[in-house]
């Protein structure tokens, strides 16, 4: 484990509760008016594993994450987090869940009026027993780990897309979560930054066993990260126990998805 990760203040989550699976979807259905997005979707994510959810745009990848965070409610089926059924949780109950599970949004979702340092420190505002000096020291450690220390005094509007993502990950880590959800972490960044994001997520996983779900259409990233793969197509989920199993599937929709990803180069080169 690298020294910066050792000193980051993050803790190993491999020895949490007795629940083997941190996330479970059991026959989840979701429709918006007549448009069915999730149809009897079931999958499990083991504690400490990284699950990659793949599929074309609009198939329900991000919708799945929003169900976990309590931003959307399933029409039917069950969702379990750390062995606890959260399907019908209230907003107040989900506030507790969000202290354990954080989400890195595609947009970064940073506060425009706050500096990078203030954005990273935001989840720590209500932490009992932390002095201002404690918060500053912790933010500095996270900034070093995420390699964003050079921009701590800048506003989000002054950052590149890739740097905003790195800051968003730092803010997500500030509350030392048990699990992290990543929504398209490499979209609209160039290959170098995409590789950096993959390195970072992999380091966090290997060092601290954070349970993760990564929504992406980036097969290069997915291949590096995936312990298991969920492929969404027409509202239904196919679950694969490894990337090799996913890649060797003969399903025509899946083969076409992989082929298109190989043939179409990344068009977004904005850092």
Briefly describe each language-model feature range.
Residues 84-85, 132-150:
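Conserved ABC ATPase "signature" region
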Residues 69:
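Helix-to-loop junction immediately C-terminal to a conserved catalytic motif
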Residues 114-122:
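Short coil-to-helix segment of the ABC ATPase nucleotide-binding domain corresponding to the Q-loop/switch region
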Residues 86-102, 132, 246-250:
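ABC ATPase NBD coupling module
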Residues 176:
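Conserved catalytic motifs of ABC-family nucleotide-binding domains
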Residues 155-159, 163:
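Conserved ABC ATPase signature
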Residues 180-183:
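Catalytic Walker B motif of ABC-type/P-loop ATPase nucleotide-binding domains
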